[in-house]
């Protein structure tokens, strides 16, 4: 973190239209994997006023009632009435899903005594830092927690005036590579008509910002921007078209680490865009948990149809306790980063993905999120 004295990250709530699309895509993936763990799935979603469109490629032996599923996801998020601008019970649902290309399947499927090839070429990054307990960058971690708290209060009825769409942004000041103060915080929440800005400001400050952000980081010069436009009644898919895969920085490290460009949601684990990024997080987190470095970024790359990664590289940004090249050797020794290997290592052929589609794929230590486990830390620590 030595290259920055101030750093900003943002997050969005589950009711943001792009996150709606991600959740729908991952709900479709989960429903298919539940009955067919060997299915091939690549599903994209678009949501706009009065409609949800799903498209993509699938190969599966199971049947899913997509219309009912998609409606339920929208209702679960909180879009259940025309009063909030979108109603999962009455919106149009359009299905444009086709079959997976036989050419792609040929390169990816396992033949007898042969490793599964990568589902596509590409490069993926994993990252960890010891600036938070969950080994995530603090700006993105707290940005997620703010909008997660907004949703919690909305759903509980404590903020009955609040609506599903919301965004947050946190700017932290760093000293010697560690966060020490909040320079600015932004929280915009969609709301019902007739609610005063004074009421919104007080509720957001006292019941969202102060309970979430560390008190010692808030100071007299911290800048607070709560619904800075003054009104946020029109939101969700009415305000903006939502698409799967448009929040890839929100999904990962808030811009503090590099990104290979591939989105996650709607993709089964044979797509290394997703599975290798999860494995990269697992590797980097274990390296930092082991004390081999304060910060660690790993890059892996693949060729379609080829099992072995075309490259593995590690950067500890000068914080490593041993040489980065030695860490690469430890990674190759203790982590199987072939597509089949990382799927088995992290038990990814499960219907666990809808939970990942809001509030961050990384830094949430849920039982299903195997890539957050630090079970390799002890064996890596032996290298010190």
Curated annotation (Swiss-Prot):
Gene Ontology process terms (BP): one-carbon metabolic process; S-adenosylmethionine biosynthetic process
Region (Flexible loop): 100-110
Obligatory cofactor(s): Mg(2+); K(+)
Keywords assigned by UniProt, alphabetized: ATP-binding, Cytoplasm, Magnesium, Metal-binding, Nucleotide-binding, One-carbon metabolism, Potassium, Transferase
SS bond list: none
Residues at which Mg(2+) binds: 18
A GO molecular function held by the record: ATP binding
Binding residue positions for ATP: 16, 165-167, 240, 246-247, 263, 267
Cell compartments where the protein resides: Cytoplasm
Superkingdom of origin organism: Bacteria
CC annotations in GO: cytoplasm
EC number(s) stated in the UniProt entry for this protein: 2.5.1.6
Gene3D superfamilies per UniProt: 3.30.300.10
CDD domains: S-AdoMet_synt (cd18079)
Entry-linked InterPro entries: ADOMET_SYNTHASE_CS, S-AdoMet_synt_C, S-AdoMet_synt_central, S-AdoMet_synt_N, S-AdoMet_synthetase, S-AdoMet_synthetase_sfam
Pathways involved: Amino-acid biosynthesis; S-adenosyl-L-methionine biosynthesis; S-adenosyl-L-methionine from L-methionine: step 1/1
Description of how the protein assembles with itself and partners: Homotetramer; dimer of dimers.
PANTHER family per UniProt: S-ADENOSYLMETHIONINE SYNTHETASE
Family: Belongs to the AdoMet synthase family.
Protein's UniProt name: S-adenosylmethionine synthase
């Amino acid at each position: 973190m030595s290259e920055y004295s101030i750093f900003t990250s943002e997050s969005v709530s589950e009711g943001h239209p792009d996150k709606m699309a991600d959740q729908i895509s991952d709900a479709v993936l989960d429903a298919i994997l539940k009955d067919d763990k060997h299915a091939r799935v690549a599903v994209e979603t678009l949501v706009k006023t009065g409609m949800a469109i799903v498209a993509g490629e699938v190969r599966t032996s199971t049947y899913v009632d997509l219309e009912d599923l998609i409606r339920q996801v929208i209702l679960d998020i909180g879009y259940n009435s025309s009063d909030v601008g979108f109603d999962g019970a009455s919106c149009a649902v359009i299905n444009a899903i086709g079959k997976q290309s036989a050419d792609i399947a040929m390169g990816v499927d396992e033949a007898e005594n042969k490793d599964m090839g990568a589902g596509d070429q590409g490069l993926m990054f994993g990252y960890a830092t010891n600036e938070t307990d969950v080994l995530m960058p603090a700006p993105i971690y707290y940005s997620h927690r703010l909008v997660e708290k907004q949703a919690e209060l909305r759903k509980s009825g404590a903020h009955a005036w609040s609506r599903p769409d919301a965004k947050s942004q946190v700017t932290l000041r760093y000293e010697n590579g560690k966060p020490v103060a909040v320079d600015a915080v932004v929280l915009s929440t969609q709301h019902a008509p007739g609610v005063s800005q004074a009421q919104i400001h007080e509720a957001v400050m006292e019941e969202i910002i102060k309970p979430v952000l560390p008190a010692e980081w808030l100071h007299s010069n911290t800048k607070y921007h709560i619904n800075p436009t003054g009104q946020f009644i029109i939101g969700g898919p009415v305000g903006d078209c939502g698409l799967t895969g448009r929040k890839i920085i929100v999904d990962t490290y808030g811009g503090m680490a590099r990104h290979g460009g591939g989105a996650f949601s709607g993709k089964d684990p044979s797509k290394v865009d997703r599975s290798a990024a999860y494995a990269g997080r697992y590797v980097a987190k274990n390296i930092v948990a082991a004390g081999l470095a304060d910060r660690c970024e790993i890059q892996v790359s693949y060729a379609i149809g080829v099992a072995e990664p075309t490259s593995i590289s590690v950067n500890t940004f000068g914080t490593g306790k041993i040489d980065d090249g030695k860490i690469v050797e430890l990674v190759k020794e203790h982590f199987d980063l072939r597509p089949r290997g990382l799927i088995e290592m992290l038990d990814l052929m499960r219907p666990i993905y809808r939970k990942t589609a809001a509030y961050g794929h990384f830094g949430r230590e849920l039982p299903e999120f195997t890539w957050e486990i630090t079970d390799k830390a002890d064996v890596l620590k032996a290298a010190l």
